[in-house]
Amino acid sequence: ALWKSLLKGAGQLVGGVVQHFMGSQGQPES
């Protein structure tokens, strides 16, 4: 179904954002 594809894409996007924030917190650039 189309909604399943959209949900999967949204899940991957959220996962990437979470990993990005976790990495940023681990190594602050400022």
From Swiss-Prot:
Function: Has antimicrobial activity.
Keyword Secreted: yes
GO terms, biological process: defense response to bacterium
Tissue note: Expressed by the skin glands.
Protein name: Dermaseptin-J10
Species annotation: Phasmahyla jandaia
Cellular component GO terms, alphabetical: extracellular region
Keywords (A to Z) from UniProt: Amphibian defense peptide, Antibiotic, Antimicrobial, Secreted
Domain of life: Eukaryota
Similarity annotation: Belongs to the frog skin active peptide (FSAP) family. Dermaseptin subfamily.
Subcellular location, record wording: Secreted
